[in-house]
Amino acid sequence: MQVTLPYGGDKTVSFNVPEENFDGFLKPGVLAPASDPVRAIERAVDRPIGSPTLDKIVRSGTRVAVICDDLSRPTPVSTVLPVILDRLIRAGVRREDIHMVMALGSHRAMTPDEIRTRVGADVYANYRVVNSEFRDPASLINLGRTADGVDIVVTREAMDADVRIGIGNIVPHPVMGWSGGGKILFPGVTGEHTVAQFHMLGGLSDQRLVGLEDSHVRLRMESWVPKIGLDFVVNTILDAKFRIVRVVAGDYIKAHRAGVETAKVLMRCRMERPADVIVVSSYPADEDFWQSAKGFFNSEGGLKDAASTMILVTPNYEGMGPHPEYGECTGDDNVGVRLKKLYDGEDIPGDPLAIAVGTSMSKLRRRCRLVVVSDGVTRAEMDECKIEHYPLCELQKAVDVTLSRYEHPVVAAVSHGGEYLL
């Protein structure tokens, strides 16, 4: 039978698999989208969870930074922003006292056209919008050390405000459990060393963290948030067609946890039995291998055992991503030793983020067999990762070769690997 998967946002690809082996597409629950998305945002903002309303948080003279996630996320920022800005202006905040910060984390800077599309043409024309900074010391400020010994270094633009509001979206995350909430600050607007801290915690953990709302990494991150200050969040939960199902707003912990409960219904898939082979599209996390590998982490829970295989079908439009050493670290069986030394404060050469995330990937590829089908990364790059690679034109070959390794394989498919959780 023929199986069709998304390949990026505007293309599909197909392969054949024996019908007797195919257990079908793994699908989560279904919830109806909001009939009026703007009204859903307004209701959430006006009835916050665990927080005062915005008119009780700001007043005339308050300087506000609205921190928005970047183009690697499907968050409908251009729909959410006007509601927030309307409430701020109505509360007396002057337009010139409001600016937007695009929370890049370690991702590349967004172009002016990308920012305009992200925030909306009207907002772009009438407000100051800046990218966060990750490495430039002159654009970062050290707020000091937390009780557990982490230096909080943050982009100055985020601190040039009395009040910070975060806009994000809730989906599974390999390290943080779920995105959203305080994650808009960590790693959104923090510097390289600080960003590396929570990725190190993820790399050092042997626990599967994706899908845990109270993972030890998230709890530590949330304990760092007061050092920067996050006064209000607005988080969306979207369905597979990126329609708003629910919006939560208010306290960065209480509102986030309420949103996670909805996200679990929309994104957690149920399986009749574990699979020998899972073919997963990275959609919508298609930007690069740094992002698309989420499809592996999200789908691992559906595998039968260590002999099982995941085949990731992904465009990787921007190649391996922003960290050139990521591939080498992924392919290093002993990269965890480097990570532990780095975490213990030793001066270890190399990109700390590549070492941290590479450790998580190195562990994953040793727990099961990984295959990447992509025209966006090369065989040489995947060889460095110790991951099998096929170009897109050989998708069928990748499936056939993989199935030939099993006597009676159980095969499943995942259409939205960047968001669905097994």
Residue ranges and their predicted role:
Residues 49-65, 90-96, 269-277, 303-305, ...:
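Glycine-rich phosphate/diphosphate-binding loops that line cofactor/substrate pockets in enzymes
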Residues 63-74, 99-105, 278-281:
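Short glycine-rich or small-residue beta-strand-to-loop segments that form or flank ligand, phosphate
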Residues 65-67, 165-167, 277-281, 311, ...:
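Structural motif
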Residues 89, 294-422:
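C-terminal non-catalytic interaction/assembly regions of soluble proteins
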Residues 110-178:
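An acidic, phosphate/nucleotide-engaging active-site surface
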Residues 147-150, 154-212, 221:
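Divalent-metal (Mg2+/Mn2+/Ca2+)-assisted nucleotide/phosphate chemistry catalytic cores
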